[in-house]
A protein has these predicted regions:
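Basic, low-complexity intrinsically disordered segments
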Residues: 1-334
Length: 334
């Protein structure tokens, strides 16, 4: 019997899926066990602070003698364990939350993030998105938490989108967006920025966030026999809607909202299917007056957000190999 029937192929896919899930759970379990061990060692070190630094030096030496093939018990790492236990006094919290990410990621957070709420957020996002250590460092150094969580965002999502899509759309949005992979020039035109973003679409997707699928730039729409072109068109699988992005190299102007409103009406009329949520527009400007932007969106019928963008050309060279491929991103968001 040839094993190529639909039933057999379905069985194979199910088994492969179960193996993958089991491997992931095993890896998480091993990581959790190791982090709890590090936590317990850190607690012991903190309980004997009065013994001074020599205690850690001797501890590292004796562990190395007892377990010569084991790594991770250097003086430096033992000090991190002590800091780890000091910052997270709740062992159950470590087991359920912190253990979602590897030890190396936790060291990054210990070094670079002081606020507990911010640290929890980066733990959650690292686990959800599968960020490498280098990507996590980059996101922290680009102030992602401040841009995505703390920013005073200008949108009309609350009044134009149903719940929970409105809340999710606001959470997805950043202000400003940081395009630090584009070579900066003072005389850059909108088309120059657009083409640079498309050339590095993997990095663009990383900055936009989870769930974005790139559909095209200068996306053609024929409306009543007239031709129109959208700067950047995406579909967001988390929001289940089209996302239209328009780029402007100068300050925000009220007429930009009207133009984007028209594009969203066209996308909803031509591309949107019955199962899709209302399309969302994102207007990216070099700068904006929040009050002017808020008044401009007040009576606009379509859901639109207005953000600034920054071009810094500071993306580390070694981050390139850490970025997921387009195929990886597509697999992750399915």
């Amino acid at each position: 019997m040839l094993m190529n029937t639909a039933e057999y192929l379905s069985i194979i896919e199910n088994i492969k899926s179960e193996i993958t899930v089991a491997q992931y759970r095993a890896a998480i379990h091993v990581n959790a066990d190791m982090l709890l061990l590090y936590y317990d060692i850190g607690c012991v070190i903190n309980e004997h602070k009065s013994w001074g630094n020599k205690f850690i030096d001797n501890l590292a030496a004796d562990i190395r003698i007892a377990f010569p093939e084991s790594k991770g018990y250097s003086v430096r790492n033992l000090k991190y364990m002590a800091k780890f236990a000091e910052i997270y006094p709740d062992r159950e919290f470590v087991q359920q939350v912190v253990a979602q990410i590897p030890w190396g990621h936790n060291i990054v957070l210990l070094d670079k993030v002081a606020d507990m709420d911010e640290r929890k957020w980066y733990i959650k996002k690292s686990a959800e998105n599968g960020w490498s250590r280098n990507v996590l460092v980059h996101q922290i150094e680009s102030n992602l938490y401040q841009r995505q969580v703390l920013a005073d965002k200008v949108t009309n999502f609350d009044h134009r989108l149903p719940s929970p899509q409105s809340e999710l759309a606001v959470q997805t949005m950043k202000d400003p967006y940081v395009f630090d992979f584009i070579p900066f020039r003072e005389d850059m035109l909108e088309r120059d920025i657009e083409q640079a973003l498309v050339r590095d679409v993997t990095k663009l997707l990383l900055e936009l966030g989870t769930g974005f699928a790139f559909l095209g730039n200068q996306y053609h729409l024929n409306v009543g026999g007239d031709d129109f072109y959208i700067d950047l068109l995406f579909y967001n699988l988390n929001l289940r809607c089209y996302v239209v992005i328009e780029l402007k190299t100068g300050d925000f102007k009220p007429e930009y909202a009207g133009q984007l409103n028209f594009y969203l009406s066209a996308v909803d009329g031509i591309l949107k299917k019955e199962q899709d949520n209302p399309s969302i527009g994102l207007l990216l400007c070099k700068s904006k007056n929040n009050v002017v932007a808020e008044y401009s969106l007040k009576d606009i019928s379509k859901p639109i957000g207005v953000s600034e963008y920054k071009i810094t050309s500071s993306l580390p060279d070694d981050l390139e190999k850490q970025l997921p491929s387009i195929e990886d991103i597509q697999k992750r968001i399915k």
